[in-house]
């Protein structure tokens, strides 16, 4: 989100209405003055989560084109303020040996929290880390993809009330495209459902959120989440499987 041309203005408006802002970013490509300006807008209730998957020699392998030095410059500025900071580290084969060193560096830089993420984002087998760092959802994802998954329950993450109206975790990406959640907006799923950006149908430039949610095929999409059998594969993977309805 930090690459939006009016990001500072948007943050300022949100703070004027007493909103709490949580920013997740790779932290790359912005000048020091840009970060200082942002930090002067944010307060101690806001947070910035830096997505850094490795160290200088490995982070760019997943975070394509990320510039290490500019990320370090950003962190050194942000940590001078009372903003909550997190280093989020997704584990891959190429960086699992750097976990302890990265955590140590995060403390040295003054980052408040180091968060280790097990992942299922494998487009190549050689990216898979050791078993202890593989997200348990990975095996379920494979079975859904192959059609060998067993019938299960489903917990609708997009609804605070089961089988109610979609009102939770709804997602709009940096291009203004709407998705039921951030997972359906992932590259591996976004082109396989009715919300595909190629259709140019559910973008907030041309529609209000209310108009999108009231569209016939959108209501049908959410209706299908009531049953594991009829739900979209993405919903089966992230809201079904070994999850419960508790």
Question: How would you describe each model-predicted region?
Answer:
Residues 1, 27-28, 54, 184:
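Active-site metal-binding loops of divalent metal-dependent hydrolases
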Residues 1-5, 28-33, 92-97:
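Acidic-and-aromatic substrate-binding clefts and catalytic sites of carbohydrate-active enzymes
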Residues 8-13, 17-20, 36-207, 211-214, ...:
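Radical SAM enzyme [4Fe-4S]-AdoMet core and its adjacent flexible, acidic
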Residues 26, 200, 242-245:
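Juxtamembrane/interface motifs at transmembrane-helix termini
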Residues 30, 150, 191, 243-244:
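Polar low-complexity intrinsically disordered regions enriched in Ser/Thr and small residues
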Residues 163, 227-246:
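Cysteine-cluster motifs in flexible loop/terminal segments that predominantly coordinate metals
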């Amino acid at each position: 989100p930090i690459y939006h041309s009016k990001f500072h203005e948007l943050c300022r408006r949100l703070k004027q209405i007493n909103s709490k802002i949580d920013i997740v970013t790779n932290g790359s490509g912005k000048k020091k003055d840009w970060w200082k300006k942002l930090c002067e807008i944010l307060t101690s209730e806001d947070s910035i989560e830096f997505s850094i998957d490795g160290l200088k020699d490995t982070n760019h392998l997943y975070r394509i084109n990320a510039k290490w030095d500019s990320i370090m410059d950003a962190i050194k500025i942000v940590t001078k303020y009372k903003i909550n900071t997190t280093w989020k580290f997704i584990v891959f084969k190429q960086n699992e040996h750097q976990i302890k060193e990265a955590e140590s560096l995060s403390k040295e830089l003054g980052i408040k929290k180091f968060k280790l993420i097990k992942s299922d984002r494998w487009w190549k087998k050689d990216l898979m880390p050791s078993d202890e760092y593989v997200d348990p959802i990975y095996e379920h994802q494979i079975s859904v993809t192959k059609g060998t998954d067993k019938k299960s329950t489903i917990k609708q993450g997009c609804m605070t009330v089961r089988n109610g109206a979609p009102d939770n975790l709804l997602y709009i990406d940096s291009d203004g495209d709407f998705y039921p959640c951030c997972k359906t907006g992932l590259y591996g799923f976004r082109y396989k459902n009715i919300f595909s950006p190629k259709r140019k149908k559910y973008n907030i430039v041309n529609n209000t959120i209310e108009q999108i949610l009231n569209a016939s095929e959108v209501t049908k999409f959410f209706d299908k989440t009531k049953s594991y059998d009829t739900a979209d594969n993405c919903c089966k993977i992230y809201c079904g499987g070994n999850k419960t309805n508790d």
